[in-house]
Amino acid sequence: MTEITETAEAQAALLSAALPYMQRYENKTVVIKYGGHAMGDIALGRAFARDVALLKQSGVNPIVVHGGGPQIGDMLKRMGIESKFEGGLRVTDQKTVEIVEMVLAGSINKEIVALINAEGEWAIGLCGKDGNMVFAEKARKTVVDPDSNIERVLDLGFVGEPVEVDRTLLDLLARSEMIPVLAPVAPGRDGYTYNINADTFAGAIAGAVKASRLLFLTDVPGVLDRDKKLINELTVSQARALIKDGTISGGMIPKVETCIEAIQRGVEGVVILNGKTAHSVLLELFTEHGAGTLIVP
């Protein structure tokens, strides 16, 4: 047997092993939050686009939600606007939100659409404004002063929280074989435009469409235990316990809390996985052991 034949047989075996998982997700909706290091790496970006295209070809209905914090910061710097933060969160004034919308719904969104279209699929770029898909209201964030222990309200400007999601447009796109690529910008009933955290936006979308899976592509392998080993699966109650005992800490806390909120909205399972691994989406959905931490009810 030649080396070429052995390689071909190995590839065929991988495809055969993936079949039951493809059947499991056929006609199911998978929401993917695309962000982190993968967005700044050309090779990883192309691998991600190919994963999304393969999902669609396999009968899955993928919906992509993307972030863009670093790109927003770069654009603000180029335009001579200083980035301001309160309690670790970006303050978004009127001028800043216009730039945020330009970067997210314009530049980044269309780059992702182009990558997916280059793989032979039909992707379409949208934001919460399109089809009145998402309405937001001003986010209410509070912090506790460590010295006085007094809670104060942060004014983050035009930072919003999604409060209404209409799935009508997403359902139409699913039936038309198109792949929605969503930027986390949405209008408020007050007429203003709001910048929404991409994780929160993805969770709201996934809950509205009752997604089978919500995938968060991050810069870490998933949730780690105290020995820094990957935890393959957690229930909501187990995740809460790990937050309480400090095993889950720092920036992973809001990520896991968003996962829990999505499950409470009707998502069947949420996965935190490493977007720096090429084809991590396919590894998670179409292999036996997955690629990250799955959180279930």
Swiss-Prot record:
Organism: Chelativorans sp. (strain BNC1)
UniProt name for this protein: Acetylglutamate kinase
Principal localisation: cytoplasm
Chain segments annotated as coiled-coil in the UniProt record: none
Catalytic activity: N-acetyl-L-glutamate + ATP = N-acetyl-L-glutamyl 5-phosphate + ADP
Site keyed Transition state stabilizer: positions: K33, K255
Gene that specifies this protein: argB
EC number: 2.7.2.8
Origin: domain of life: Bacteria
InterPro entries given in the database record: AceGlu_kinase-like_sf, AcgluKinase_fam, ArgB, Asp/Glu/Uridylate_kinase, Glu/AcGlu_kinase, NAGK-C
Listed pathway(s): Amino-acid biosynthesis; L-arginine biosynthesis; N(2)-acetyl-L-ornithine from L-glutamate: step 2/4
Cellular component, GO annotation: cytoplasm
Residues where substrate binds: G68, G69, R90, N195
